Curated annotation (Swiss-Prot):
Protein name: Threonine--tRNA ligase
Any one GO CC term of the record: cytosol
InterPro entries referenced in this protein's UniProt entry, alphabetically: aa-tRNA-synt_IIb, aa-tRNA-synth_II, aa-tRNA-synth_II/BPL/LPL, Anticodon-bd, Anticodon-bd_dom_sf, Beta-grasp_dom_sf, TGS, Thr-tRNA-ligase_IIa
Cofactor note: Binds 1 zinc ion per subunit.
């Protein structure tokens, strides 16, 4: 007498073994048309399966929150099936789901092109039209191995050998005659996989090991209905329009090249943005009483061993040799700041010491992960390290929080999310020290009226951490700011101060970052603003365009007037139609376009319009300059409207 329990908490008793079809007809016959999968005791089951013992059953229809991943798992292996149909000699390595989609890694003799994606997508659509049932089978280790050996699928054989015990069963899914290793619950019938799109091709090392073969990864997205798919594709189109790499190239801000992967060649206009942002942070550093320092790019490997960074991050650290001595190209600033702290004896009266640096850091990121300004190998950290006593921690944390929010408020992000990462299993320090430290951070967040989410066990082994995540207008989250307590590094690098009892005491270090990486933050801003940066950050703030040659003298006069008050200005005296000039400079995202013709020259005024197309009409030059200066000095995020 099997007792069947359902996801909604109800249960039903049967006097004999019963098929899943019969259970559905008794429980919820209306679900049959939209039923994509059934889970029995958290495992996929076929409709014809008979239940002979007590079981927990969940019906998954298209409205169920689990449906999306089930469809994506199915699409991932549908793609694998399509690949084998078109290119029988291609070897499937792995397939899986990711956020918003799925992927398949393949080993193939030639590079896959955009045209190939269309070919594969059409093949997938053809297979979906067959409306075949997807079958799940449990077979022995040796049977599974034999199936993939016969197909010359060496990657599948490798996965079975490494991940499955030889005495265990192997779960396979069958798309018609194509067999693949179970990666996740799939739909009953392929007809539920209509709404997908293949998107792009990338490269990835087998098992993420750069010593292994480079595979080709095909990415796709899949949804439960056409509306959701179209909505997602529209979102991706918007992302593409805002892509900082395209905008950066069009506006001539920077470029990158193969001879220096992950390194940025800043052009003049991009470097203006960089310096303006850096100078803004400098103003805040002065306001919050930080001292700015500069530490060497090369530091002996011995320091990095002492700090513990070599043991934990050596694969990401670039090194170089000179006179039989090995140096590390610094991946972070903290050990260098500790050297400055250690360079002379400190008293408790000297603390807190707030040390900031715009440090040029290098990290050996995998080439496949590099992405414009967002993921680079050389970046500028705006971090700081506060050396303080245990008693000063709370007030310093409080000031860090205020500084972070003060700076972020300038950029008007949609939302700031806050997360508090607490002690991991492997850690240093006593439980009482961790209790105090975590309470210090949480109390300061509460005192500042900030709601936050706990990330249990996600802190570093040397201390808890607060993360500040910026949410942009497209609902993407960017983790930028951090406040991290560290009891470990000063101990490792023998830092101490003399307390009021004339005893040596180890200081606490607070690691603090606001922008994180200046390069990455510029990329975030470009995408958030679609390249329409606020006037104070814009490389060119004003362009003056002439209507006729007659007004060129007045244009030059205006150019000098604006330049003399440090407004970044350009002239356009070309013999082109005025509409063409306006359109071109609007596309260049220049905040204000000044138009000068005979009327403006004779009245000594200017006609002003902004890049949104708002026309201010003809106004007094000095009045406009004052308004513009105010907008720049106050770092207003929005342009003047009147």
């Amino acid at each position: 007498m099997p007792v069947i329990r359902f996801y909604d908490g109800s249960q039903q008793v049967y006097e004999h073994s019963v098929s899943l079809i019969e259970i559905i007809k008794n429980k919820k016959p209306s679900i049959m048309k939209s039923l994509i999968a059934i889970s029995v005791n958290n495992h996929f089951s076929n409709l014809n399966t008979f239940i002979r013992e007590d079981a927990f059953i969940e019906f998954v229809d298209q409205k169920n929150y689990k449906a999306l991943n089930i469809i994506r798992y199915s699409c991932a292996q549908l793609l694998s099936y399509a690949i084998k149909n078109i290119w029988p000699l291609a070897q499937i390595a792995t397939s899986n789901i990711i956020e918003d989609g799925f992927y398949c890694d393949i080993d193939f003799k030639r590079s896959i092109s955009e045209k190939d994606l269309i070919l594969l997508e059409n093949q997938m659509k053809t297979l979906v039209k067959r409306e075949y049932n997807i079958l799940n089978k449990l077979i022995s280790y040796s049977e599974a191995r034999e199936i993939f050996q016969k197909c010359f699928e060496k990657y599948k054989v490798s996965l079975i050998d490494e991940n499955i015990n030889c005495n265990s069963k192997v779960s396979l899914y069958y798309h018609e005659n194509y067999a693949d290793i179970d990666i996740g619950l799939q739909v009953f019938n392929i007809k539920f996989c209509k709404y997908f799109k293949l998107q792009k091709i990338g490269g990835v090392y087998w098992k993420k090991n750069k010593n292994n073969k480079m595979l080709q990864r095909i990415y796709g997205t899949a949804w439960t209905n056409k509306q959701e798919l179209d909505k997602h594709l529209d979102y991706l189109n918007e992302l593409e329009k805002r892509d900082h790499r395209k905008i950066g190239k069009f506006l001539q801000l920077y470029h990158m090249q193969e001879e220096s992967p992950g390194m940025i060649f800043w052009h003049n206009k991009g470097w203006i943005i960089f310096n303006e942002l850096q100078n803004f942070v400098r103003v805040k550093l002065k306001e919050y009483k930080y001292e700015e320092v500069k530490t060497p790019l090369l530091i002996d490997k011995l320091i990095w061993k002492q700090s513990g960074h070599w043991d934990n991050y050596k694969n990401a650290i670039f090194t170089t040799l000179s006179e039989h001595r090995e140096y590390c190209i610094k991946p972070m600033n903290c050990p260098g700041h500790v050297q400055i702290f250690n360079s002379r004896l400190k008293s408790y009266r000297d603390l807190p010491i707030r040390m900031a640096e715009f440090g040029s850091c290098h990290r050996n990121e995998p080439s496949g992960s590099l992405h414009g300004l967002m993921r680079v190998r050389n970046f500028t950290q705006d971090d700081a390290h506060i050396f303080c006593t245990r008693e000063q921690v709370r007030s310093e944390i409080n000031d860090c929080i205020k500084m972070i929010y003060d700076l972020y408020s300038t950029f008007h992000f949609k939302k700031i999310l806050v997360k508090l990462s607490t002690r991991p299993e492997k850690r240093i320090g006593t439980d009482s020290l961790w209790n105090e430290s975590e309470k210090d951070l949480s109390d300061m967040l509460i005192e500042n009226h900030l709601s936050f989410e706990y990330q249990s066990g996600e802190g570093a082994f040397y201390g808890p951490k607060i993360e500040f995540i910026l949410q942009d207008s497209l609902d993407r989250n960017w983790q930028c700011g951090t406040i991290q307590l560290d009891f470990y590094l000063p101990l490792r690098l023998s830092s101490f101060y003399i307390n009021e009892k004339n005893e040596k005491k180890v200081p606490v270090i607070i690691h603090r970052a606001i922008l994180g990486s200046i390069e990455r933050f510029i990329g975030i801003l470009i995408e958030e603003c679609s390249g329409n940066l606020p006037t104070w950050l814009s490389p060119v703030q004003v362009v003056i365009i002439s209507i006729t040659d007659i007004s060129s003298g007045y244009v030059k006069e205006l150019f000098k007037k604006f330049s003399d008050v440090n407004i970044r200005i350009e002239c356009d005296l070309r013999n082109e139609k005025i509409g063409f000039k306006i359109r071109e400079h609007t596309l260049r995202r220049i905040p204000y376009i000044l138009i000068c013709g005979e009327k403006e020259s004779s009245s000594k005024k200017i006609s002003v319009r902004n890049r949104q197309g708002h026309n201010f009409g003809m106004i007094d030059v000095d009045f406009f300059i004052k308004k513009l200066q105010k907008e720049i000095i106050t770092r207003n995020f929005y342009q003047m409207e009147e």
